[in-house]
Amino acid sequence: MTKKGKIKTAIIILFSAAVLFAAFSVTGKTLMKLAYPMKYTEYVEKYSGEYGVESELVYAVIKTESSFNPNAVSDADAVGLMQMTPETFEWIKTKLGEEDKDLSLYDPETSVKYGTFFLGYLLDEFENTDTVLAAYHAGRGRVNGWLEDEKISSDGKTLNEIPIPETAHYVKKVNKALNVYNNLY
């Protein structure tokens, strides 16, 4: 093969590799966006702005809690996109001064509004995202008890460990999703 032929072959190989790389990159990103969608954007953006919560955190919680299924129901009877229990829902209604009996956590806007309010409330109370997520999953009272235990919290504000494996796993899953949302969008 001549020098000119070798150069032409090398250029074709490099061009083909570049095209394959670009196609894989686009496909990989597209697949990640399918796995980590941004649904209910109008509600997430509205209420994350209103309650001072990073929208990516709201998406990460929804992804982890219900995988964007507004009809999801957990074993603990938490329902909707953000998986809230009826008791927590009623408590938040009093915090917001709302008495509407027709509100439903199966309604995406209601779920996002109340779940995002609760995340904002927990962020104000605990400040640390891992502690907030533990409280969202295990309950504020339980987490406040953990913070009083010197074996679990050395400063009374941050959890050194999360004593319930299911809650620790939940916090890791939300953080993974949060990392993906922060890097993907």
Cite the ranges covered by each PLM segment.
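Catalytic glycan-binding domains that act on GlcNAc-containing polysaccharides
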Residues: 23-185
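N-terminal Lys/Arg-rich, disordered targeting/topogenic segments
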Residues: 1-6
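Hydrophobic membrane-insertion alpha-helices, especially the h-region
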Residues: 10-26
